[in-house]
Amino acid sequence: KMKVYSMNMGDEILEIAIGDYQVVNESDWTNYIKGVLWAFEKKEMVLPFGMDLLLFGDLPSGAGLSCSASLEVLIGFIVRDLYGFDVTNVDLALMGQQAEHEFCGVNCGIMDQFAVAMGKKDHAILLNTKTLGYEYIPITLSGVKLIIANSNKKHKLGESKYNERREECETALEEISQAIGIHALCDLDEKTWNLYQATVKDDDRKRRVKHAVTENARTKQAAAALKNGELKIFGELMKASHQSLSEDYEVTGDEMDALTEAAWQQDGVLG
């Protein structure tokens, strides 16, 4: 068995029976641990013995800073290194996503787990989530500070608009693909979207696709700006990204909107 204690959660010492992984309570944070152990077992990597695990983290829970993905990837690293399993960092990211999808019942993307598993100091990652092809982009801040602020709005992916937005995008993709042979919204560029947006019948779905298409373009522009050290352009793209998330994708919320708008009013803020 595995004994787990979290200094953050303040619970008693919790026990997980090796090989008997069940979701007893959907809000139980140990489901993320169980899910990763379950994902190893699905790959026929069974833990030969248990362990005692003491956990502490400095990410605020539920702040949209990938604390669940961080826990999943951490458990993956521990299990791989302790038991000598042959899995790559990308494998661990995918297993974390699989744990959320199939064990925890949360429909999530791969970005969080990939960033945690593959992160590199002083670099951003340009990731193609369709192919998992990636490129490290050096970040040279040159006197500019990157500030991470907590809006204090609690975020749970399972309770967020993620699943609803994903369904809207998938429905829109079905509509568009009847006119042109695409398999994902990332196959659309802005010019093609402008030509075929009438194939999407619902105005809300149109705005969701507009966000996806323009965000892809902004991401590529942002990578180029970082490579060239053009931080002002990068900041402008970040601002445009938030505005699109707020107005077209509608996932930011009043707290995040207020925080970003207050930041934009400060002298020296690039985005």
Predicted features, each with a name:
Residues 56-62, 101, 190-193:
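Short, internal active-site loops enriched in acidic
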Residues 1-69, 73-89, 94-95, 108, ...:
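ATP-binding N-lobe of GHMP and related small-molecule kinases
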Residues 44, 104-107, 245, 249:
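Flexible interhelical turns and helix-capping residues at alpha-helix boundaries
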Residues 2-26, 123-271:
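C-terminal nucleotide
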Residues 88-100, 233-241:
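Short, well-structured alpha-helical segments that form the helix of a local strand-helix-strand
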Residues 79-83, 100, 242-245, 249:
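Short amphipathic alpha-helical interaction patches enriched in hydrophobic/aromatic residues
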Residues 115-116, 218:
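Hydrophobic side chains within alpha-helical segments
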